[in-house]
Amino acid sequence: MSTAKLEDSTQRPLYGERIIEESKIICFDNPNKKRIYEISIQLPEFTCKCPFSGYPDFAKLNITYQPNLKVYELKSLKLYINNFRDIKISHEEVVNRIMDDLVNEGLPHWIHLNAAFNPRGNVSMQLDIFSGQKRN
């Protein structure tokens, strides 16, 4: 078996990488603006990189919100979240950045973002951020 380095024959960047790089959160009109209701979204495969070691950090993101005029389109949200996979960023900074983008794009009545980071080096971390006023 040859030990020569195999050349990558695929074109760079791959179409999936381009789509992720260009991603942004897209919203569409709330189909029932008169009703107060909650939507929960789970994103169990969030990844970013530790800004100090460069090692990957993994988390489960849970978003619960009460839509106002818009709701989040799920595929765009998935691609937006996947864009963080190669970014060196602290847990605190990335969760706050995601929350800012969610609030700015969707303008929900109320939103809660929970990020449960997997243990690394015997330490796990969970962040909870809220914005707006919850309605009953």
From Swiss-Prot:
Q: Which terms does the record give in the GO molecular function aspect?
A: preQ1 synthase activity
Q: Which Pfam families is this protein grouped with?
A: QueF
Predominant location of this chain? cytoplasm
User: By its UniProt entry, which InterPro entries does this protein fall under?
Assistant: GTP-CH-I_C/QueF, NADPH_dep_7-cyano-7-deazaG_red, QueF, QueF_type1
The reaction(s) annotated as catalysed by this protein in its Swiss-Prot or TrEMBL entry are: 7-aminomethyl-7-carbaguanine + 2 NADP(+) = 7-cyano-7-deazaguanine + 2 NADPH + 3 H(+)
**Function (record text):** Catalyzes the NADPH-dependent reduction of 7-cyano-7-deazaguanine (preQ0) to 7-aminomethyl-7-deazaguanine (preQ1).
A cellular component annotation (GO) from this entry: cytoplasm
* Pathway linked to the protein: tRNA modification; tRNA-queuosine biosynthesis
Localization, per the record, is: Cytoplasm
Q: Which gene encodes it?
A: queF
Taxonomic lineage: Bacteria, Bacillati, Cyanobacteriota, Cyanophyceae, Synechococcales
What EC number(s) does its UniProt record assign? 1.7.1.13
**HAMAP family (UniProt xref):** QueF_type1
Alphabetized UniProt keyword annotations: Cytoplasm, NADP, Oxidoreductase, Queuosine biosynthesis
Q: Into which family does the record put it? A: Belongs to the GTP cyclohydrolase I family. QueF type 1 subfamily.
Binding of substrate, residues: Y72, E73, L74, H91, E92
User: Per the record's keyword annotation, is Oxidoreductase included, yes or no?
Assistant: yes
Gene3D superfamilies (UniProt xref): 3.30.1130.10
Question: Which GO BP terms apply?
Answer: queuosine biosynthetic process; tRNA modification
Q: Does the keyword Oxidoreductase apply?
A: yes
Q: Which organism is it from?
A: Prochlorococcus marinus (strain AS9601)
Q: Which residues form the active site?
A: C50, D57
Q: What protein is this chain from?
A: NADPH-dependent 7-cyano-7-deazaguanine reductase
